[in-house]
């Protein structure tokens, strides 16, 4: 957990000068596995020899209520490097395929009754994503991706 927070802090510090760039965005998303999430993404192309690379900080949460007494919660936070594939794959200018790889920390909570009343745990691992963004307007993108925390996901990104 401390490694993730340290990495997020460093990413924000090193990309803070890029906050005014038009390709930075904040996004919200929802998956078909009932995961809700949000992310901040900062363009670091200038720091990466003008490669189409960005840093994404994300938070995702899943809650399943099994009955009136039992609830399972999973929350993930992390950081990922995102590579825009438009320099490799020639598509419409409004379409931006991408892939990403990063680290995430996941916390689990089981609340219930009986022999196993409560359980909490923390784990960490790789975060893998790939998808496509479609520019609706210069300020709004639709984002469709597949990742290993939430599965098939749809969302919207708002550039700042």
What are these regions (language model features)?
Residues 22-33, 52-63, 99-105, 137-149:
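Transmembrane beta-strand segments that form the barrel wall of outer-membrane beta-barrel proteins
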Residues 1-23:
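Cleavable N-terminal export/targeting peptides
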Residues 20-23, 45-52, 86-96, 139:
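Short loop/turn motifs that connect adjacent beta-strands in outer-membrane beta-barrel proteins
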Residues 149-160:
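Outer-membrane beta-barrel "beta-signal"
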Residues 30, 42-46, 81-87, 132-134, ...:
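Residue-level signature of outer-membrane beta-barrel architecture
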Residues 21-23, 53, 57-74, 105-124:
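Flexible, solvent-exposed loop segments that connect beta-strands
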Residues 25, 37-41, 78-82, 127-129, ...:
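Membrane-embedded beta-strand positions in outer-membrane beta-barrel channels/transporters
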Residues 63-107:
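Mid-chain, structured segments of secreted extracytoplasmic proteins
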């Amino acid at each position: 957990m401390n490694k993730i927070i340290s990495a997020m802090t460093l990413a924000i510090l090193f990309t803070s000068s890029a906050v005014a760039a038009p390709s930075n965005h904040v996004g919200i998303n929802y998956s078909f596995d009932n995961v809700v999430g949000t992310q901040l993404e900062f363009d670091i192309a200038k720091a990466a020899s003008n490669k189409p690379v960005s840093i994404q900080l994300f938070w995702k949460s899943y809650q399943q209520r099994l009955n009136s007494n039992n609830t399972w919660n999973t929350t993930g936070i992390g950081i990922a490097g995102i590579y825009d594939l438009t320099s490799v794959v020639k598509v419409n200018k409004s379409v931006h395929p991408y892939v990403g790889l990063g680290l995430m920390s996941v916390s689990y909570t089981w609340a219930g009754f009986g022999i196993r009343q409560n359980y909490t745990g923390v784990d960490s691992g790789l975060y893998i994503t790939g998808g496509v963004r479609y520019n609706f307007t210069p300020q709004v993108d639709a984002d469709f991706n597949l990742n290993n925390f939430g599965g098939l996901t749809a969302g919207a990104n708002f550039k700042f």
